[in-house]
């Protein structure tokens, strides 16, 4: 029995360029879907789709809360990608009914002690100077929004523009959407770009890109992430993302629709790819300091993933030759920057002028 080809594949067959995308994490999948929607014939090569950094990520779309001092070139990328995210969610929904976990509830950032309050205040001033919307709250106001917060916190701010997706749901939806759009998947591990039969190639396989493209200075930055389940009688424990500082250590708690909380994340460069006891202990301790009822939750899992970092923490995003576009090195911001990576990656493949200045992201800047 023959089946009528899906609309996406019909368009690709008629007008598309043949494109290979190396890597099926969040960047590779969103780029592949965007290219397929533009009418191209797309093949994705990855022996284990959505099993790398995307599998372990928290999924915060937080261009304001994720601000780090002295990383000014990163801010416009983060803000722009956050603005483009609704379009990416809409594109995904065009090809699949599977959920993405996209939520626009906003974020609270809280301070545990007086020193943390000072840090939060100084960070808020820095964010405001860069045009970011941050609303200062009293402890009473913060606890009215999230009653599970500890009465011992010392300060809080609300960031309504910081949202979230659930990465495991999102990548599952993207895989389904890509297939519906006509994308082909192989389980191949790519050892050489020359072996790919394609007009254009997008290298989006995270840390593995350095084996395919000389001159990329990528390093693995590991992070421990926890998941706990909220008891039914306490659900929902939180209604929005809660980030905080505990003795100057950052921690976040992300509520999910399935009744779990994601708690993260440590940052280490020790080469150890399993969750570390010290990191698990630190995250639980700090989460309980901010939300005491976490102590009553069921422990679900601890995972550790390697994020692809660069020397300046900016991604490698750009064309390196007539056939090859590089899109990797997104470090801690891969989920957030996926909307930008997908759209700009597709623009580069189509030889269009990118919608944002990419000069700081030149893949050759460290070679």
Predicted regions and their residues:
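Short loop/edge segments at beta-strand edges and connector loops
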Residues: 46, 138-139, 186-189, 301-303
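N-terminal Rossmann-like FAD-binding beta1-loop-alpha1 element of flavoenzymes
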Residues: 18-43
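Helical element adjacent to the flavin cofactor pocket in flavoenzyme catalytic cores
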Residues: 157-193
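C-terminal catalytic lobe of FAD-dependent flavoproteins
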Residues: 297-367
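Conserved Rossmann-like nucleotide-cofactor binding loop
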Residues: 27, 50, 208
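Short hydrophobic core segments
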Residues: 22, 197-208, 342
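Dinucleotide-binding Rossmann-like beta1-alpha1 core, especially the glycine-rich loop
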Residues: 60-141
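Active-site substrate-recognition segment that forms the wall
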Residues: 33-38, 47, 60, 98-102, ...
């Amino acid at each position: 029995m023959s089946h009528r080809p899906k609309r996406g594949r019909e368009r690709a067959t008629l007008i598309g360029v043949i494109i290979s995308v190396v890597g099926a994490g969040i960047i590779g999948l969103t780029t592949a879907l965007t290219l397929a929607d533009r009418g191209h014939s797309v093949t994705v090569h990855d022996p284990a789709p959505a099993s790398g950094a995307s599998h372990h990520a928290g999924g915060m779309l937080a261009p304001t809360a994720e601000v780090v001092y002295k990383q000014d070139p990163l801010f416009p990328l983060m803000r722009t990608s956050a603005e483009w995210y609704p379009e990416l969610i809409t594109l995904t929904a065009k090809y699949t009914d599977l959920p993405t976990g996209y939520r626009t509830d906003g974020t609270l950032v809280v301070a545990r002690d007086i020193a943390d309050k000072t840090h939060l205040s100084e960070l808020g001033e820095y964010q405001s100077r860069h045009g970011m919307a941050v609303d200062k709250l009293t402890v009473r106001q913060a606890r009215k929004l999230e009653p599970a917060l500890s009465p011992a916190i010392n300060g809080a701010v609300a960031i309504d523009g910081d949202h979230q997706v659930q990465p495991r749901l999102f990548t599952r939806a993207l895989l389904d959407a890509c297939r519906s759009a006509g994308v082909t998947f192989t389980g191949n591990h790519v050892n050489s770009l020359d072996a790919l039969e394609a007009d254009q190639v997008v290298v989006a396989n995270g840390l593995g890109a350095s084996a395919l493209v000389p001159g990329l200075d990528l390093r693995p930055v590991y992070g421990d992430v926890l998941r706990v389940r909220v008891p039914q009688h306490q659900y929902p424990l939180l209604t929005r993302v809660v980030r905080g500082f505990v003795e100057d250590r950052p921690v976040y708690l992300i509520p999910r629709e399935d009744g779990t909380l994601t708690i993260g994340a440590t940052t280490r460069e020790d080469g150890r790819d399993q969750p570390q006891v010290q990191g698990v202990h630190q995250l639980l301790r700090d989460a309980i300091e901010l939300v005491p009822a976490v102590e009553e939750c069921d422990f679900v899992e601890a995972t550790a993933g390697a994020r692809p970092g660069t020397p300046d923490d900016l991604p490698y995003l750009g064309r390196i030759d007539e056939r090859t576009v590089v899109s990797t090195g997104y470090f801690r911001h891969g989920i957030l920057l996926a909307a930008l990576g997908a759209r700009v990656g597709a623009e580069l493949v189509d030889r269009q002028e990118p919608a944002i200045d990419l000069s700081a992201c030149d893949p050759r800047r460290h070679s």
